[in-house]
A protein has these predicted regions:
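Short, basic, alpha-helical segments at the C-terminal edge of helix-turn-helix-like DNA-binding modules
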Residues: 1, 30-37
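Helix-turn-helix
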Residues: 1-24, 28
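Hydrophobic alpha-helical connector segments
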Residues: 22-24, 28, 41-68
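Alpha-helical transmembrane segments of polytopic integral membrane proteins
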Residues: 39, 70, 132-135
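Amphipathic alpha-helical packing segments from all-alpha helical-bundle domains
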Residues: 61-78, 85-112, 120-124, 156-162
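Hydrophobic/aromatic-rich alpha-helical bundle segments in the mid-to-C-terminal region
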Residues: 109-156, 164-165
Length: 165
């Protein structure tokens, strides 16, 4: 809080008055991140896409945007959660919100998926393939471009979830 107050040129009491606590700061950072990534709007666009492949292309793009614009936010969350129980609670809440949002998308898209997949299975596959850690592994440590990741994710989601023609 002290660093934020110093950087903003305000008293620490002002920071507390606005954000209340560390969770409030993390929520504000996350809100800006969601806005910058545009991923929620892309998911809404995907939900009205009548073509299953097009739907998954859009969510691959949304996922790429989410992690591409969120690397610093993820580092902030991880670092804060490692040392502060309040921040750990906020991280847990954020991840639960992500699961809920993705599960909603899967439920709304389930008519496109392979018949042998339950909604729970499709959700688990989808959530696993769209983890930040997977994006980070491929783009940061394995030399993939964000375009490579997006193309791979779209193809892999289609292979894993869609009925084959």
């Amino acid at each position: 809080m002290e660093v934020i107050a110093e950087q903003a040129g305000v008293a620490i009491s002002t920071v507390y008055a606005i954000f209340k606590n560390k969770r409030g700061i993390l929520r504000a950072i996350r809100a800006v991140w969601h806005q910058e990534s545009g991923q929620r709007d892309i998911y809404q666009e995907a939900l009205v896409q009548p073509d299953a492949g097009g739907r998954l292309d859009l969510v691959a793009h949304a996922t790429r945007r989410q992690w591409e614009t969120g690397a610093s936010m993820i580092a902030i969350y991880r670092g804060a959660a490692a040392t502060d129980s309040e921040a750990a609670t906020e991280l847990h809440s954020a991840l639960q919100g992500r699961r809920t949002h993705l599960n909603h998308f899967i439920e709304a898209s389930s008519t496109f998926f392979r018949q042998e997949l339950t909604t729970a299975q499709a959700s688990a596959i989808f959530r696993a393939l769209t983890l930040a850690e997977l994006y980070e592994e491929l783009t940061t440590y394995s030399g993939w471009s964000a375009d490579d990741y997006e193309q791979w994710l779209a193809q892999t989601l289609k292979q894993q979830l869609l009925m084959q023609k």
